[in-house]
């Protein structure tokens, strides 16, 4: 157990796990929101086949917003996340970066990127 000295709150390992996955969900929200808001179809888990077929822009906005809501819950409602707490920010950033690279590789194959 770690202690957040700013607030005196105990930081448990599962807080960091939540921040890591919060970063991953935050990263996953971006391509869906950007494509959906731009009116473009994009892959989603609801397409046929899942992750390869295209879903409507509306489905992508809804899926992107769901991912954003999950990121909010994992980052801001678990523990006491602080932007000035370097280990917490690095943990969130690691989840964001790992998911971003995975998404780039996955969608790059479909769109000619990688």
Which residues are covered by each model-predicted region?
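Cytosolic, membrane-interface loops and tails of multi-pass inner-membrane proteins
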Residues: 36-52
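Membrane-helix boundary connector in multi-pass membrane proteins
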Residues: 71-90
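Short, Lys/Arg-enriched N-terminal segments with co-localized hydrophobic residues
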Residues: 1-10
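Transmembrane alpha-helix/helix-exit interface in multi-pass inner-membrane proteins
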Residues: 25-39
